[in-house]
């Protein structure tokens, strides 16, 4: 099923800028910050890329998508349901515990947490990377040029605000499928 998904994405004109095999070992143990997230199409493109660069890639998706027949398919594809409304749901702790087991694990998260414009990104992706001691790897969705690629790893410094500003500043409004839904950081 994954190969079919990747093939369909390529047929839609997407170019995957893939690192040379084995050249980026950090891609097997990291948190991907995938942005700009302004469309449901981000999921199709992002997962097709993740499956090509990770040995064990997981994608966090809001639980509402798991209702009905799509649920088993999403679980089979390595997706994890997120209950964003439940404060008792410790997804950061669960993700950190998974990393602590060792071995390949990469988690893709859209830090905006919504396809709507947001001024403040969610902090969970930073917390997971910081607590697990793994890098954050920016993953760029460029709808204008139909390209997706990853940037250099960013290790958390302990200064969440500075790290978030650094990461957010990498993503540009013109890359988004719906630029009006992405709030770019002004330098």
Label each PLM-derived region with a short phrase:
Residues 176-187:
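Charged, glycine-interspersed solvent-exposed loop segments at helix/strand-loop junctions
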Residues 14-173, 187:
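Soluble catalytic domains of membrane acyltransferases
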């Amino acid at each position: 099923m994954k190969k079919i998904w990747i093939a369909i994405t390529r047929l839609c004109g997407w170019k995957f800028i893939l690192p040379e095999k084995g050249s980026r070992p950090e891609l097997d143990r990291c948190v991907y910050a995938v942005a700009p997230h302004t469309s449901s199409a981000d999921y199709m493109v992002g997962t097709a890329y993740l499956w090509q660069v990770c040995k064990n890639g997981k994608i966090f998706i809001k639980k509402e998508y798991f209702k009905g027949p799509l649920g088993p398919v999403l679980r089979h594809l390595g997706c994890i349901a997120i209950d964003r409304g439940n404060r008792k749901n410790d997804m950061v702790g669960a993700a950190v515990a998974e990393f602590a087991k060792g071995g390949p694990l990469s988690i893709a998260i859209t830090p905006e947490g919504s396809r709507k414009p947001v001024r403040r990104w969610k902090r969970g992706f930073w917390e997971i990377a910081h607590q697990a001691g793994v890098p954050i790897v920016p993953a760029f969705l460029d709808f204008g040029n139909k390209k997706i690629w990853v940037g250099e790893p960013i290790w958390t410094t302990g200064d969440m605000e500075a790290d978030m500003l650094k990461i957010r500043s990498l993503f540009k409004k013109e890359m988004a499928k719906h630029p009006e839904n992405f709030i770019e950081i002004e330098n």
